[in-house]
């Protein structure tokens, strides 16, 4: 102990000597409790929506965007906020991850958009919680399959229309894979389908026995041997069609190596190869057996229908996606067959005249029993054999039934995916049709607007030859009223003055009638007069703003009388909204060729309420409504004039 003290005591004394000058000086003040910068509140603005959180909350994950110093690039010094131009609904789930440590996947959001948000904020998909992980993976897998199908559809020609400068290979491949693109492709589609059916039917019919010439006894032989020339010509025509189709597909394929390795390409080769081998091989007894074997492969032509049947394609995709389940089923059946065949052989070995002569011979009984077929050609006779046969039958039911739900679910999933793909293609066609219709409608509206005088020639500028004519709101309402009246009355109204000239020619003062019609005012020596029924009841007059005339309250929006020419026989349509121009002039001509229609415009009366009610100049209680036309020499009432009073 003493040695230990002697060892460290010199160091303690030296330290005390070194501290002595510092001890003579006053100690600094004790540090006060000061708020740490890590506890400050940060404001995060995501597309206008403000989120507030503690800085320590974001610092929990320094490897992410919000937890590292990289977020300072998004700091706005003026507002004191971190601004992100991202989806605020997605950010709510991201911020909850910083708070709780568990990342949840929103069901109502797109899974691809969610992955993009996670990648932006530096979060990996493995952080998704266990409660949402399975659904997240299923949705992501389904989205990946959909994108792969869309990409395959674009490559095979089911996608959008090809551009104008497409090559002949692209157009030909699109016609093969999507026959509905053109009439020629559809015709070729049905022709190949017809020859496939003819080839399969001929392959079946040529084996039917046919009777030859009348002999005693009658001799029967297959139809293929009875009529060899007819079946040979039929087979030759089918093979030529199949060969031409295969060569054209090989020429038009985007990737020839990939096409040669495809299943459908192998089916095409197997379907046409036996014919050419039969032409090259001599017909003798030595090679007749091999030739007959090759003729069996002609039955594979029936698989060519898979190009014409969506159900067969779905079945093929289902079997391909269930390869692991089918492999498990085959492995389980193989094990069960070997086990039960061995047991049945030794159980029936001691009996006489037994069919279970060997273990391979017992395979047939085991396969038939496990698949619940039960032909009855091999049956056990001992009690042990019957017991093990019953166990074999029950085991087969269980082994076969286990993978069936998985296969059915995959078939249903692929079927619904194809339905959604067909629906998307139909919606895309409808959308493109609507776009074309909208473009056509926009063009027609522009031409109609130009035809109606909405555009005027601007000769001063070279860049813009046509410009929009400036119209007042009252003038637009004037033409709108004309258009509505033409639709409701089936008459066409012609104008004799431009709208501005018609307004300038009508004077608001010097009224001699209580009528509210502009046409009842004298505007010239040769003008025709039109009036409505006189107003004999006294009304309170009001004064308009910026006007010296008073207007009765009942005549503010009243349209008294309207005269229009009846249309000539023909289509009840109007070529122009605001004009019926001369025959020698274009529709988009100068404004002097367009004149305003005679329409009763509400005009303030000049008399006071206390004055008497004079009659209209037309005389009588009801004045005749006429049409002003500058081309008529004298005032007259046209025989085809239509009068619409007090609309």
UniProtKB/Swiss-Prot annotation:
The gene is KCND1. Belongs to the potassium channel family. D (Shal) (TC 1.A.1.2) subfamily. Kv4.1/KCND1 sub-subfamily. It catalyses: K(+)(in) = K(+)(out). One of its GO terms (molecular function) is metal ion binding. Disulfide bonds: none annotated. Residues 360-371, 372-379 dip into the membrane without crossing it. Residues 1-183, 253-263, 309-323, 416-647 are cytoplasmic. This is A-type voltage-gated potassium channel KCND1. Residues 206-230, 285-287, 346-359, 380-386 are extracellular. GO terms for cellular component: dendritic spine; neuronal cell body; postsynaptic membrane; voltage-gated potassium channel complex. Residues 144-164, 510-531, 564-584, 601-634 are annotated as: Disordered. Component of heteromultimeric potassium channels. Identified in potassium channel complexes containing KCND1, KCND2, KCND3, KCNIP1, KCNIP2, KCNIP3, KCNIP4, DPP6 and DPP10. InterPro entries: BTB/POZ_dom, Ion_trans_dom, K_chnl_volt-dep_Kv, K_chnl_volt-dep_Kv4, K_chnl_volt-dep_Kv4.1, K_chnl_volt-dep_Kv4_C, Shal-type_N, SKP1/BTB/POZ_sf. Its main location: membrane. It holds the Pfam family DUF3399. One of its GO terms (biological process) is protein homooligomerization. Keywords: Cell membrane, Ion channel, Ion transport, Membrane, Metal-binding, Phosphoprotein, Potassium, Potassium channel, Potassium transport, Transmembrane, Transmembrane helix, Transport, Voltage-gated channel, Zinc. The modification Phosphoserine is found at residue 555. Residues 474-489 are annotated as: Required for dendritic targeting. Residues 521-530 have a biased composition (Polar residues). A-type voltage-gated potassium channel that mediates transmembrane potassium transport in excitable membranes in the brain. Mediates A-type current I(SA) in suprachiasmatic nucleus (SCN) neurons. Exhibits a low-threshold A-type current with a hyperpolarized steady-state inactivation midpoint and the recovery process was steeply voltage-dependent, with recovery being markedly faster at more negative potentials. May regulates repetitive firing rates in the suprachiasmatic nucleus (SCN) neurons and circadian rhythms in neuronal excitability and behavior. It is found in: Cell membrane. A motif (Selectivity filter) lies at residues 372-377. Residues 310-323 are annotated as: S4-S5 linker. The transmembrane segment S4 functions as a voltage-sensor and is characterized by a series of positively charged amino acids at every third position. Channel opening and closing is effected by a conformation change that affects the position and orientation of the voltage-sensor paddle formed by S3 and S4 within the membrane. A transmembrane electric field that is positive inside would push the positively charged S4 segment outwards, thereby opening the pore, while a field that is negative inside would pull the S4 segment inwards and close the pore. The zinc binding sites in the N-terminal domain are important for tetramerization and assembly of a functional channel complex. Most likely, the channel undergoes closed-state inactivation, where a subtle conformation change would render the protein less sensitive to activation. It is a multi-pass membrane protein.
């Amino acid at each position: 102990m003493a040695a230990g003290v002697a060892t460290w005591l010199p160091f303690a004394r030296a330290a005390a000597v070194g501290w002595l000058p510092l001890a003579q000086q006053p100690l600094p003040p004790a540090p006060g409790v000061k708020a740490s910068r890590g506890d400050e509140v940060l404001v995060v603005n995501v597309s206008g929506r403000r989120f507030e959180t503690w800085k320590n909350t974001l610092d929990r994950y320094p490897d992410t965007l919000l937890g590292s110093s990289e977020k300072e690039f998004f700091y706005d010094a003026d507002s004191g906020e971190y601004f992100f131009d991202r989806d605020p609904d997605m950010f709510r789930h991201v911020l909850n991850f910083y708070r709780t440590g568990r990342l949840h996947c929103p069901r109502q959001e797109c899974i691809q958009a969610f992955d993009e948000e996670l990648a932006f904020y530096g979060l990996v998909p493995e952080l998704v919680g266990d409660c949402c992980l399975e659904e997240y993976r299923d949705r992501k897998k389904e989205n990946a399959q959909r994108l792969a199908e869309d990409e395959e559809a674009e490559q095979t020609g089911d996608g959008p229309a090809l551009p104008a400068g497409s090559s002949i290979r692209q157009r030909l491949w699109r016609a093969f894979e999507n026959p509905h693109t053109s009439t020629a492709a559809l015709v070729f589609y049905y022709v190949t389908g017809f020859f496939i059916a003819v080839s399969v039917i001929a392959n079946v019919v040529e084996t039917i026995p046919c009777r030859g010439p009348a002999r005693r006894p009658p001799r029967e032989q297959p139809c293929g041997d009875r009529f060899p020339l007819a079946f040979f010509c039929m087979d030759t025509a089918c093979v030529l069609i199949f060969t031409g189709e295969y060569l054209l597909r090989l020429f038009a394929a985007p990737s020839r190596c990939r096409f040669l390795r495809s299943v459908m390409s192998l089916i095409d080769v197997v379907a046409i190869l036996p014919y050419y081998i039969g032409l090259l091989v001599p017909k003798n007894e030595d090679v007749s057996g091999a030739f007959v074997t090759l003729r069996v492969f002609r039955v594979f032509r029936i698989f060519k229908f898979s190009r014409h049947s969506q159900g067969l394609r779905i079945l093929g995709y289902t079997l391909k996606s269930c390869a692991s389940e089918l492999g498990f089923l085959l492995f389980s059946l193989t094990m069960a067959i070997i086990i039960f065949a061995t047991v049945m052989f030794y159980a029936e070995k001691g009996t006489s005249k037994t069919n279970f002569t060997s273990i391979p011979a017992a395979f047939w009984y085991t396969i038939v029993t496990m698949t619940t077929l039960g032909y009855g050609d091999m049956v056990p006779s001992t009690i042990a054999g019957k017991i093990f046969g019953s166990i074999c039958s029950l085991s087969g039911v269980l082994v076969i039934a286990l993978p069936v739900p998985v296969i059915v679910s995959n078939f249903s999933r692929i079927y619904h995916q194809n339905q959604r793909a067909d629906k998307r293609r139909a919606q895309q066609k409808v959308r493109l049709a609507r776009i074309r219709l909208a473009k056509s409608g926009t063009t027609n509206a522009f031409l109609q607007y130009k035809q109606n005088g909405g555009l005027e020639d601007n000769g001063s500028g070279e860049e813009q030859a046509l410009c929009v004519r400036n119209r007042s709101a009252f003038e637009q309402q004037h033409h709108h009223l004309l258009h509505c009246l033409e639709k409701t009355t089936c008459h066409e109204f012609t104008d004799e003055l431009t709208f501005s000239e018609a307004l300038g020619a009508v004077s608001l003062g010097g009224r001699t009638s209580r009528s509210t019609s502009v046409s009842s005012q004298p505007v010239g020596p040769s003008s025709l007069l039109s009036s409505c029924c006189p107003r004999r009841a006294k009304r309170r007059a009001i004064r308009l703003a910026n006007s010296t005339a008073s207007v009765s309250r009942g005549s503010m929006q009243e349209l008294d009388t309207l005269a229009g020419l009846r249309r000539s026989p023909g289509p009840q349509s109007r070529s122009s909204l605001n004009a019926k121009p001369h025959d020698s002039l274009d529709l988009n001509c100068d404004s002097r060729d367009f004149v305003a229609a005679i329409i009763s415009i509400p005009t303030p009366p000049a008399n006071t309420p206390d004055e008497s009610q004079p009659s209209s100049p037309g005389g009588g209680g009801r004045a005749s409504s006429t049409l002003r036309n500058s081309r008529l020499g004298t005032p007259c009432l046209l025989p085809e004039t239509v009068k619409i009073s007090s609309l």
